[in-house]
Amino acid sequence: MPGARLVASHILNFGESSTVKNPTSIRLSRISLALAMALGSNVVLAQSTTGSIFGQAPAAEGETVQARSSSGVTREVTVGSDGRYTVGSLPLGTYTVSLVQGGKVVDTRSDITLRVGSGTEVSFAAASGATTSLGAVTVSANSLPAIDVSSVDARTVITSQQLAQLPLARSAEAIALLAPGVVPGYSGFTSGTTGTSLVSFSGSSVTENAYYLNGFNTTDPLSGFGGISLPYGAIDQQEILSGGYGAAYGRSDGGVISQSGKRGTDEWHFGAQVQWTPAFARGTSPNSYYVSGANDGEIYRRYSQNKSWETTESAYVGGPLIKDKLFFFAAVEGDKRSGNSLGAVTSSYNTQYQYSNPKWYTKVDWNINDNNILELTGASTKTSYKGNLYNYDYDTKQTGDLNSFDTSTKNSAQVSIAKYTSYITDDITLTALYGKQKMTYFSQTPGYDPSLTYINGSEFENPAITGGNSIVNAQTVLTADNPNHRATSNNLRLDLSWKLGDHTITAGIDNLNSHDIDDGQTGNAWIYAFGDPSTPISDSPFVAAPNTGAGGETGYYVSKYLYSTSASVRVKQRAQYIEDSWQVDDRWLVKIGLRNDQFTNYNPNGDAYLRMTKPQWAPRVGFSWDVHGDSSLKVYANAGRYYLAMPASVALRAAAGSLYTNQYYTYTGIDANGNPTGLTPLASATGGAVSANNEYGQSPDAKTVASSSIRSEYQDEYLLGFTQQINADYVWGMKGQVRKLRNILDDICDTGTIAAKAQALGYDIDPTTLNGCYLSNPGRANTYRIVNPAGGYYSVDVTKEDFGMPHAKRSYYGLETFLEHPFDGVWQAKIDYVYSKSYGDSEGQVRSDIGQSDVSATVDWDFGKVMENSNGLLSNDRKHQLKIYGSWQVAPEWMLSGNIALLSGTPKTCLGYYGADESNPVGYGSYYHYCGGVASAPGAAGRQPWQHIVSLSAEYRPVWADKKLGFNVMVYNLLNESVATSTYALYGNSKALNTNYDRINYFSTPRYVRFGINYDF
């Protein structure tokens, strides 16, 4: 469906600074490491907040290994007859691991830090003490295992120590950009609750990712736009899974962002931080100009007078309430941003705005006993905005009097999680997690005047009437949200892990429910437009040419736009999985998993309109081969299928009865408020308002909303790679990744073809009673139910050939290579390069080139003619990605860090009217894959420019303050390069070129400097 919502321009914003801490270095034997990683079998659930410890010890009768954390967790397991042991499902933290023989500790390893989702090797030999040496080779526990031969996926884990060293923005998405294959998404797509910019994983759309917080799914239940994340200082570790993840994960065919929060220990710690980005240290993007049509060369939007400043204040405290038993951690963060933003010349206001983004996080850990742990988590994030609109004169560059108040928003999300872990035996672990998420979405416009109609497209007002100066009014609201809108979700997980010899079997259930309450929008506007005077505005539904009405002789016309959606809907998702981690021998590890997902979406009446509950088997298979048996070279591979659920918001336009109409007129005048006068209605198929998608407000029968043969969207993925230890200091590797989208779910609106097929079958139907659009599997044959006037339903099979549509496809190919030097107490760095290609005829659930956020209800697949020439480079294609980041401890008191991203530009699209004659056969205007009458596939219009983002930071921690006090400065985008990331894609036609075509919509973030002071005790 053509996008109905207008969005204001924003600036893509990734990149902030951090503080520095020095990890303690513990030396372990590399040979011992290799043995244990080759022989140890350990499984950690991908979305869990746990890790494991495994290794080798000299076999002795009654020998055990004891692991004790800084938060009092103690586990003791028996060493097997082969000398192997595994301590699984351990809460993250720092551990002391001891070898016990005859009831006495004979050897100990201290300061062992776990990584989420990973195994940490700790091996023992006959020697005692904190260091074991075999030959002349020793290794550091903090930098190794450099090669994890127990993993088969594409995983990046960023720890709190790294976050304290690297110049990064304070968001989950900015951290995720460190991972290979993860790139910024379309700048206009932001998280509905937090407002942060979103990311794309390996060619997938930004709505196909999953977010987790302490094991709980916090993905936006309404549309999949982002998820809830922690205060930056409360993040212990962030796990980024970009491919190959196990059966415990689902509902994602993009990537996974999983955050684990900090917890209290047996020592009290507290700290605070203040960061400040002043206006004088922030650059501005270049001004945006028209580059086409009648306004070519004129300014569109001025950025040079925009100013903003930001402050972030945060604090934390954590420690024992009862030593070794009960622990507490809490963190708060307050971010405030103020400034001004000039609107476009068509809406020339200077908006003085304020943002406020408070967050908090608490965690309580109760070690009931050595075998049972209870964890309670609470978290909250809020985002509020308010602004005043002042008149602005683009000619004089002066700001005038207050015009009106901008729409203010207050969004919030609160999360509550309880997790129980029971170590039933040394080999059996049960985990139960239950969490709730409550969200509110409030907006209002102070002084809103409903008597004023929003004016859209004022640049297309007839200059013979206006004299070339746009006429608008004080109305700034196109669509108004329901102020009572709220949502809830809950997630129940049960996971059981059982070690049976060389096999570790993990199985569980993953149930997620969400409820979208009082969601909806209403809007109306006058939309001015310009076209060929003698060409019908639309062929289907028919709207006559402009020159058939008074005042339309030169091609100028206007439409009265009405839009309304309103609903309360819910979604039920269920899943079951099982996975076997099989240590075949000392070099081969095989992981075999199977997941089954079921998805059901309900309309406002509680009737299921999408019921995909038949088995949706998602196999996951992978292996790891320790080639030499010493962990110096790993070859691994993975293959899997991933299903994607439909979020709640799909029901608003598909199943709840939406109104989306335009009534067309010519006009002979425009009043002082921008309203057209002297209106002459243009002839239309309905005699009045028309809807290209038959959205006239009727509520569809739930059984007819979707194809009866519909299946979920799913993707197949394949990984093949290797990682090699070059020497004691460097690791390099390569990885190939292939993704194939096998099935998509979107709406098809070609009801004429469905009606014709039904009539050809002899069915007696009234075409005007059909739904506006049907949820379908485009590119495949679909079966539709049509209401039988006598009762019951007709069943109509329609093929993709009937619709004139191509086969649906999205393919991604990526080749990655990297070189890494782990932190050795002095410096660390990683260089990562990805060469990739993403192409096909469907980006996914949303469409970036036109900024359309209607999930699975985009322009794509509505009609066969809008899919002609649609196969090309997709919007998230980045041919080249080079990422370099690292830190250097220049002196005991000084740390320098850098983060560099060199990214090739995304493809550009040119969309125009249909065919060589530039007609409009299905009423979609300039949304066909033709440009000036010539076929134009995605990417045929070229690419956006490269982005070269160089960010540096420095921190000073003086010895006189015992290094507890830190002063830091960070410069984001040192080169101050601000380039186009998105341009306007609608060409219009050769006789009436759209003057907006190819003008810049969004720029990359210009340079800014951030200063900080922090204290950690």
Language-model segments: residues:
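Periplasm-facing N-terminal accessory domains of Gram-negative outer-membrane beta-barrel systems
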Residues: L45-N142
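Periplasmic N-terminal accessory/gating domains of Gram-negative outer-membrane beta-barrel systems
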Residues: G103-A127, G135-R263, G297-R301, E310, ...
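Transmembrane beta-barrel wall of Gram-negative outer-membrane proteins
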Residues: H269, Y303-G387, S408-T431, P619
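Repeated loop/turn-to-beta-strand initiation elements of outer-membrane beta-barrel proteins
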Residues: K325-F328, N371-L374, D427-L430, D502-I505, ...
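Solvent-exposed loop/turn elements at secondary-structure boundaries
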Residues: N469, P604, R611-A618, G622-F803, ...
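Gram-negative outer-membrane beta-barrel transporters
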Residues: D585, L589, F599, D729, ...
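C-terminal beta-signal and adjacent terminal beta-strands/loops
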Residues: D729, N743, C749, K837-Y839, ...
